[in-house]
Amino acid sequence: RELLMTWMGKAQQIRRQNLKVNAVASKLFSMLREDGLRCCILKGQGNALMYPNPYSRTPGDIDVWIDASREMIMEYARKRFELGDDIRLQHLETSLDGVPVELHFFPCSMNNPIYHARLQKWFRRNADLQCSHIVGLPDGAGDIAIPTSSFNVVYQLTHLYHHFFDEGIGMRQIIDYFLVVNDFSKNVFLDHDLSNHPVNFSNHPVPLSKEGSTFSPSPSSSGSGDVTAPS
């Protein structure tokens, strides 16, 4: 009974944290859009929407990818946020209403410079669709843009790759990616009548290591978008 009460208390704590982060994520997204910056909330709040209970995922900081140049993002951040010294290759760190925020110049990096360049090219090619993919947060907390299913299945795998080599992988990342793959399979494959709209894998190879390789099933009605492998 004591353990059950501890778990119930922890669940309520996580719920309150999610309510706070959702409100701030919506505020941040609206602020950036009103200031003329196209953006997309990565991982956290979008991933939570795939959970059976969207308040059950332990939230972290808010990662927002801003579709603008590094110089423009830096100039904007200096005007609108308090910045510390932690400015990295792919993001800078700040906070909004007490919630840690990472403003991303690009979503993720790779250690190999050739693969990194290909990945950034792919990010730029798909940026517009991600910043246009608007969803509603639970209980009317507001709207945010999140990545499509087909973008997530590639992006979050590279994020796991980065964690594996540089930071370590936690259970949250593993569960997140399981739900990402599950969401991708439902939105991109199971919603299609493959007998009428076959996906020809021989014409659309998936490997990321070959220049020009693509895999592009037609978008589903849920807005999952296309899948084009980095090349």
How should each PLM-predicted stretch be described?
Residues 206, 217-220:
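Ser/Thr/Pro/Gly-rich low-complexity, intrinsically disordered segments
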Residues 1-60, 65-194, 198, 205, ...:
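Conserved NTP-donor binding/palm subdomain of two-metal-ion nucleotidyltransferases/polymerases, i.e.
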Residues 214, 228-229:
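Ala/Thr-enriched low-complexity intrinsically disordered regions
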Residues 211-212, 222-225:
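Glycine-biased, low-complexity coil/linker segments
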Residues 53, 220-221:
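N-terminal low-complexity, intrinsically disordered patches enriched in charged
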